[in-house]
């Protein structure tokens, strides 16, 4: 039996929003959060944890989610906010912004992981939620695609770092570029590999 057909402890009447983030680990750029309220009468096939989908499939689902969801919202916390608050608090901030920007107010919010942002709505953390709750899967896809597009756009301004390919993660290519060129305005100064270059 598929997980979504099993009665779940978080089944609640009314609108349900799924929330997830992308970009906690990279050395640069914002952390992006998305909140999605799906339309049960307009289902989307193939929703899954964004990390398990090909980039092409994520792109296709991104457009389908934007077209079919009752409402969705994407928000971010900047690299500057990450450095000021720390990555966990900045992630919670981005998630709260995403939920508060929804056009419709959900009855309950399900958040991927084991931490919850401070919300004025009933909420629950669901470990592995991006694989078992369709609304969280949809949110993970929106956040991931939005951030990947952001990196591709920023790459045009700073092509020497290779952001379009590694998306800001701590790859050998990125670390070599960081050592050669120093940090750009979007690098997270509080992250160790960036801080080392700035010493």
Curated annotation (Swiss-Prot):
> Its function?
Endonuclease that specifically degrades the RNA of RNA-DNA hybrids.
What is the protein name stated in its UniProt record? Answer: Ribonuclease HII
Report the residue ranges that make up the RNase H type-2 domain in this protein. 14-199
Q: Where in the cell is it found?
A: Cytoplasm
Q: Which organism is it from?
A: Polaromonas sp. (strain JS666 / ATCC BAA-500)
Q: What cofactor does this protein call for?
A: Mn(2+); Mg(2+)
Please state the Enzyme Commission number of this protein: 3.1.26.4
SUPFAM superfamilies, from UniProt? Ribonuclease H-like
Q: Can you state which reaction this protein catalyses?
A: Endonucleolytic cleavage to 5'-phosphomonoester
Residue positions binding a divalent metal cation: 20-21, 112
Q: Which GO terms describe its cellular component?
A: cytoplasm; ribonuclease H2 complex
- Identify which top EC class this enzyme belongs to: hydrolase
MF annotations from Gene Ontology:
manganese ion binding; RNA binding; RNA-DNA hybrid ribonuclease activity
Superkingdom, according to UniProt? Bacteria
How is the cofactor bound, as the UniProt entry phrases it?
Answer: Manganese or magnesium. Binds 1 divalent metal ion per monomer in the absence of substrate. May bind a second metal ion after substrate binding.
The main location is: cytoplasm
For this protein, the record's InterPro entries field holds:
RNase_HII, RNase_HII/HIII, RNase_HII/HIII_dom, RNaseH-like_sf, RNaseH_sf
UniProt entry keywords in alphabetical sequence = Cytoplasm, Endonuclease, Hydrolase, Manganese, Metal-binding, Nuclease
Q: Which PROSITE patterns match?
A: RNASE_H_2
Q: Name one GO biological process term.
A: mismatch repair
Q: What family does the database annotate?
A: Belongs to the RNase HII family.
Q: Which Gene3D superfamilies match?
A: Ribonuclease H-like superfamily/Ribonuclease H
């Amino acid at each position: 039996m598929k997980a979504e057909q099993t009665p779940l402890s978080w089944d609640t009447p009314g609108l349900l929003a799924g929330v997830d983030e992308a970009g906690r680990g990279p050395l640069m750029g914002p952390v992006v959060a998305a909140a999605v309220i799906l339309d049960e009468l307009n289902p989307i096939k193939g929703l899954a944890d964004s990390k398990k989908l090909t980039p092409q499939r994520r792109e296709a689902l991104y457009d389908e989610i934007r077209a079919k969801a009752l409402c969705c919202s994407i928000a971010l916390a900047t690299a500057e906010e990450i450095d000021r608050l720390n990555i966990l608090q900045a992630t919670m901030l981005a998630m709260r912004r995403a939920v508060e920007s929804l056009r419709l107010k959900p009855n309950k919010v399900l958040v991927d992981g084991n931490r919850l942002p401070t919300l004025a709505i009933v909420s629950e953390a669901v470990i592995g939620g991006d694989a078992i709750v369709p609304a969280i899967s949809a949110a993970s896809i929106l956040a991931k695609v939005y951030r990947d597009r952001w990196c591709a756009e920023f790459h045009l301004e700073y092509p020497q770092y290779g952001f379009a390919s590694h998306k800001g993660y701590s790859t050998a290519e990125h670390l070599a570029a960081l050592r050669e060129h120093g940090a750009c305005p979007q690098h997270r100064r509080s992250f160790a590999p960036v801080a080392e270059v700035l010493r």
